[in-house]
């Protein structure tokens, strides 16, 4: 089964998210986000589906980062702090080759926790080691900040058009592979 695109910037993957949102229509308000190069956002409210697309850039997919890669063998997919030290989980085990989107979000949250990254996104050490040889640079942090800002702008705009604020949304669903591996606590910590 191949789903059609909704429009030039809202593709078939987003259509599957919107189909899920439609299936949940008994619920009051649901926001769904499909994060990729385009951040596609859907809002189900008052029996109507509204959507928008933002230019999130590829940072959440690991692309465009100094050591970014897709979520495949060798990618750091999760990072935790244990006894004051970063501990990374690498897909497939073995030595890390790069870092994927979920790993970047975790790594930034951990660097914040360890006070090696401040609230403005400034790294104490550039590059910051995550799982040697994998590290994050100041430019990587800025790319993630730009992607986050694009998603946030899309969410706020869509809510404002519908006369809502963030607190009005009953649920937020993050779709796709990225959504499946994203640690909600890490995402919340980095904003």
Give the label of every model feature segment.
Residues 23-26, 47, 81-84, 109-117, ...:
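Generic secondary-structure signature for well-ordered alpha-helical cores
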Residues 104-147:
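Gly/charged contiguous loops adjacent to phosphate- or pyrophosphate-bearing nucleotide/cofactor binding elements
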């Amino acid at each position: 089964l191949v789903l059609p695109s909704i429009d030039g910037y809202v593709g078939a993957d987003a259509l599957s998210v919107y189909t899920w949102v439609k299936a949940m229509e008994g619920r009051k308000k649901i926001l769904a986000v499909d994060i990729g190069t385009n951040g596609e956002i859907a809002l189900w409210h008052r029996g109507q589906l509204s959507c928008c697309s933002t230019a999130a850039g590829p940072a959440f997919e690991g692309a465009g980062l100094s050591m970014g890669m897709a979520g495949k063998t060798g990618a750091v997919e999760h990072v935790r702090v244990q006894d004051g030290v970063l501990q990374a989980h690498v897909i497939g085990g073995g030595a890390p080759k790069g870092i994927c989107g979920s790993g970047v979000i975790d790594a930034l949250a951990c660097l914040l926790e360890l006070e090696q990254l401040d609230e403005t996104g400034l790294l104490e050490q550039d590059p910051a080691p995550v799982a040697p040889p994998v590290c994050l640079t100041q430019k990587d942090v800025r790319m993630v900040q730009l992607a986050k800002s694009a998603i946030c702008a899309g969410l706020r705009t869509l809510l404002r058009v519908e006369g809502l604020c963030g607190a009005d949304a009953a649920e937020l669903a993050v779709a796709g592979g990225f959504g499946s591996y994203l640690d909600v606590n890490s995402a919340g910590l980095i904003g």
